[in-house]
Regions:
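Conserved acetyl-CoA-binding loop-helix of GNAT-fold acetyltransferases
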Residues: 81, 87-100, 127
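Acetyl-CoA-dependent GNAT
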Residues: 5-11, 15-77, 95, 101, ...
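Conserved N-terminal entry element of GNAT/NAT acetyltransferase domains
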Residues: 1-9, 145-149
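Terminal substrate-recognition subdomain of acyl/acetyltransferases
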Residues: 127-131, 137-149
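Conserved active-site alpha-helix within GNAT-family acetyltransferase domains
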Residues: 92, 104, 116-134
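Conserved GNAT acetyl-CoA-binding A-motif
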Residues: 102-114
């Protein structure tokens, strides 16, 4: 298994994995995963690190982050490992690769959002040195049709 920065050739596999689960859904009006153009723009950008876990030429996991250099802050947007490959520390390897890249970018703060009831995600982040924050309500407004369901 190899962890590497995502390339444009990885986009379709990332989208297929991302659309295969409901964990990324934030409301019933918004697409459940990133539009293809958004992912392509992220991969081309230096501000949006995306790493993939690859085994036998197949992407089996990914992590997507959004770094804001003005605030020196990163939001981990998504982390996913194919259920058939969980329990092998792949999520930790993806997170470690991301954190190393963020240090290179001079990032000073990293956060992520997840459903309160997603205890496995909460435990994953706690185990990897994150602190549990306060409970929040997700609010959104669609400005472009590409995000409509």
């Amino acid at each position: 298994m190899e962890i590497k920065p995502a390339t444009l050739e990885d986009v379709d596999q990332i989208i297929n994995l991302g659309k295969s689960v409901s964990e990324f859904q934030v409301s019933d009006r918004v697409v459940t995963f990133w539009p293809k153009k958004v992912l392509i723009d992220c991969i081309k950008s230096k501000q949006n690190p995306i790493f993939v876990a690859v085994e036998d030429s197949q992407i089996i996991g990914f992590i997507i982050a959004n770094y804001n250099p003005s605030f020196k802050k990163t939001i981990i947007e998504n982390i996913f490992v194919d259920p058939d490959f969980r329990g092998r520390e792949i999520g930790k390897s993806l997170l470690d690769s991301l954190l190393n890249r963020l240090k290179e970018l001079d990032c000073e703060y990293v956060c992520s959002l997840m459903e309160i009831k997603d205890e496995s995600a909460v435990q994953f982040y706690l185990k990897n040195g994150f602190n549990r924050g306060i409970n929040c309500v997700w609010m959104d407004r669609i400005l472009e049709d590409s995000f409509k369901k």
